Amino acid sequence: MHIEQIKLTNYRNYDALALNFSPKINVFIGENAQGKTNVMESIYVLAMAKSHRTTNDKELIRWDSDYGKIEGAVQKRHGILPIELTITKKGKKGKINHIEQSRLSHYIGQMNVVMFAPEDLNVVKGSPQIRRRFIDMEIGQISPVYLHDLLTFQKVLKQRNHFLKMNQGKSMSNDVMYEVYNEQYIHAATQIIRKRFQFMDLLQEWAEPIHAGISQGKETLIIKYRTVAGIEKEHSSSEIENTLHQKLMEAREREFDRGVTLVGPHRDDLQFLVNGYDVQTYGSQGQQRTTALSLKLAEIELIKQETNETPILLLDDVLSELDDYRQSHLLNTIQGEVQTFVTTTSVEGIHHETMEQAQLFHVKQGAIEKS
């Protein structure tokens, strides 16, 4: 899979922009705050219908416009597929082959991307919220059903939290509505937990040998999905539901005191173990970067396995974060097979062989010149 062309209308600092890309390597060169990351972001947004930089979609729309639009021509195994995402202040609409989709979950997954930016190091060393977002975004690319389940869970969680907030501090010994909300919540939460365990098993299969290769056999990476309810991947759906029910009963008084749900997948986390040690707490900066790189390369392989298409790789100002050895391993792995986009302030430090294959784009004050 590769993207042949992108058109931007009223997106960030661009009122109108059209670019054609190489199916191999595309390098955007320019100083900071010139607009090169906006192009990279637009490719990601076209694929995922959300930004990796902001949760406020209004920021994606050019300041003097009511809407923004991204159009792309994606070369897939069976031909070229036009896709389009329109962003307004009221929401987003996606089109596949010029047909508007009733749900964004039907749109996401038509173009697969793997983004590696400096902030992705936070997947390893940052907050649990970042890691949960990582899981949800990656599963969503390969499973539209998961996106639907996630939206259902978020809706039920919001309703349950509202119920707890409205009854905060009250004694609810035999409340029928409490049981109704619990039943809906437990069912929705179970779907998310099961699919996350399944995804982490698949990711582990790829990440472990990749990490071993980068570390020259010196390190073993184990990824664990940790639930606040103490659920294990071997548990059946009914066992997960029973455990959630038990933990909710135990947390009942605290939940009514605080007016918020304390048990469920919205509070779960990932743990990365290198040679048995938690890399977030005890790992060196080099080990944390190797873990992050292993995850990204594993994502590429997993998406290929599950979709039968090679995803597009976006390297946003990240090569400077990797030493020569890790950069070499990354570029050698993707050489010639994965369409790659790179942003950088200087071509120095990028391998000569990579630059020989690359299509260069010079970015200055929002103007892009192809060379």
Swiss-Prot record:
CDD domains in alphabetical order: ABC_RecF
Gene3D superfamilies: P-loop containing nucleotide triphosphate hydrolases, RecF/RecN/SMC, N-terminal domain
Localization (cell): Cytoplasm
Pfam families associated with the record: SMC_N
Matching PROSITE patterns: RECF_2 (PS00618)
GO molecular function list: ATP binding; single-stranded DNA binding
Keyword line: ATP-binding, Cytoplasm, DNA damage, DNA repair, DNA replication, DNA-binding, Nucleotide-binding, SOS response
Claim: Transmembrane helix is one of the keywords in the record: no
Keyword Nucleotide-binding attached: yes
GO CC annotation terms, alphabetical: cytoplasm
Coiled coil: none
Gene Ontology biological process terms in this record: DNA replication; DNA synthesis involved in DNA repair; double-strand break repair; SOS response
Positions that bind ATP: G30, E31, N32, A33, Q34, G35, K36, T37
InterPro entries named among the record's database cross-references: DNA-binding_RecF, DNA-binding_RecF_CS, P-loop_NTPase, RecF/RecN/SMC_N, RecF_2
Family the UniProt entry places it in: Belongs to the RecF family.
NCBIfam families in the record: recf (TIGR00611)
Function field: The RecF protein is involved in DNA metabolism; it is required for DNA replication and normal SOS inducibility. RecF binds preferentially to single-stranded, linear DNA. It also seems to bind ATP.
Protein name: DNA replication and repair protein RecF
Protein encoded by which gene: recF
